[in-house]
Structure formats: structure tokens, C-alpha cells
Amino acid sequence: MYLVTVRIKREGDKPINEQHLVEAVSLTDVDTKIRREFSGVDADITSCKVINFTEVFENGEGWFYEIKNEIETLDSKKVVELYLQEASDDRLAREYFRNEVGDGEMISFVKKPYYGIIR
């Protein structure tokens, strides 16, 4: 799953950014699905991040965490992971984060909507 920011320019309007969750197997697959979803509209992908979570939240709102995890890759780099957690308030969301991630260092924690799931 990828969290994709799409810059959309509709005729006569200022460009807007929308975030969509995209079920895809690769970045090429993400690009294909976004182009299909926004065919006929001036739309560009401005960012794309892999996102890890166990459930897909259909209501379009969740708590996003960017986490620097102490996982070493083959080239000895630390991994930055993005998680999505649905919670009714900030306190619960942070509690879920600590239970789920444990020792990871939280580098951002925000609540924001996404606009839909593109399959």
C-alpha cells in the first residue's frame, strides 16, 4: 500500500493536493492506477510513500506517523516507515503507536484525511 500525494489542476481552479491510499505492487503500478483514476484531469504525483498498517480505514481519516525504526538494511541504513492508525483521539493514537512500534523513534505524528482508496 502506498500513500500518494496527487497535485490536481482542474480548469479555472487553483491546483490542490489530495492524498490517496493506493493498493499496488510497485511504483510503476501506482503510476498506472493514478493515471487511470485521473484520466482527463491534469494530475501529477508529487510524493509517494510505502505505508504499513493492518486495516484499511474506509472513513478517510486516520493518524499518520512517520517513524524512524532501528531496522538496519543491507546497505546499513535506518528505515523510515509510515504507519496509519485510526483512533478517536490523540492519546489513544499515541498509545496504539507505542504498542505497535515499540522502540521506533517517532519523527512526525499528524491527523489528516485522505481522499479515498485506489485499488
Where are these regions (language model features)?
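Short, well-ordered alpha-helical segments
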Residues: A24-F38, Q85-G102
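Beta-strand elements of well-folded, non-transmembrane domains
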Residues: I8-G12, S26, N69-T73, E86
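Short, mixed-charge low-complexity intrinsically disordered segments
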Residues: N17, R36-T73, V80, N99-R119
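A short, exposed loop/beta-hairpin motif centered on an aromatic-Gly-Thr core
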Residues: P15-S26, K77-D89
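Short, extreme N-terminal segment that most often corresponds to the first beta-strand
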Residues: M1-N17
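Intrinsically disordered, low-complexity sequence elements enriched in Ser/Thr/Gly/Pro
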Residues: T5-I8, L92, I117
